[in-house]
């Protein structure tokens, strides 16, 4: 009977550790799976164009947003090509 209980208890620990490993794999995959653009980037680009257009005439295609992951950080790079001063 004791071996049967230890077998059952041992299975629970093993099952728990397997579930924990699977959860860690899923979380790691979700953290690194941010290769696609977030939903807010197009709206952010439109807002930037609207704000900059209040002050200078700018072509909307001259604003570029790029999101990349560096180590554990998401880095948003904004490039704005300003017109030459006249």
Curated annotation (Swiss-Prot):
The reply to whether Magnesium figures as a keyword in the UniProt entry is no
Annotated GO biological process: cell division; regulation of division septum assembly
Cleaved signal peptide residues: none
Keywords noted in UniProt: Cell cycle, Cell division
Family, per entry: Belongs to the MinE family.
Classification via NCBIfam families: minE (TIGR01215), PRK00296.1 (NF001422), PRK13989.1 (NF010595)
Protein name in the entry: Cell division topological specificity factor
Which gene is this protein's source?
Answer: minE
């Amino acid at each position: 009977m004791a071996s049967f209980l230890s077998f059952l208890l041992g299975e629970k620990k093993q099952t728990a550790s397997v579930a924990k490993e699977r959860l860690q794999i899923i979380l790691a995959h979700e953290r690194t799976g941010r290769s696609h653009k977030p939903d807010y980037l197009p709206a952010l680009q439109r807002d930037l164009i609207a704000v900059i257009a209040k002050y200078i005439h700018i072509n909307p295609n001259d604003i570029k947003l790029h999101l990349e992951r560096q180590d554990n950080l998401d880095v948003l790079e904004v490039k704005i090509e300003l017109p030459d001063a006249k």
